[in-house]
Amino acid sequence: MGRPKKNKKKNSRVKNSNLKKIIAGVDEVGRGSLIGPVYAAAVILDKSCNRKILKDSKILSKNQREILSKHIKKNSIWAIGKSSAKEIDKGNILQASLLAMKRAINKLNKKPTKILIDGDKLPKLKDFKMKAIIKGDQKIPEISAASIIAKVSRDKYVVSLARKYFKYSWDKNLGYATKEHLRAIKKHGINKHFRKSFAPIKK
């Protein structure tokens, strides 16, 4: 006598429920800076990563971000994507940000089953299930982790530029339009790292 059909359905449900969900969080940094690339990070957190300590990178101190960045990198799958100042000038900052996100996602060495992205726009990617979440960096640990890694990575790059272009104090303003930075631009002009499509650089 054969087994009842209901057992087959039950087994099917159990099998489906056991499918592992792989969630990736994605965020970008540096959109408002007057210089350099916009950075994006994609992060798949491991179970060993402490999600409770992950917060939006903007509300963390520099020291906190650097400590958390090391913790995240040690306990996750992650990747960085960038769009250069030239790419930003060629199109616009939104499209460049989405391109950086796309590059970060494509560099992950494991394919996520779902991608959660900070903001209200999605990059153009096939074969990925994606969802945009406004203020996701404040709500979703995976996105918070991405914001931290992206922020630390970009800040280190800008600080490295400041050693050569010390007149602009990029190690302090990180390329943003502070009064001191604008005065330095007026006095010394611009160089190849500036986003020429950005006000007040654009004339």
Name the predicted role of every residue range.
Residues 1-203:
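RNase H-like, Mg2+-dependent phosphodiesterase core
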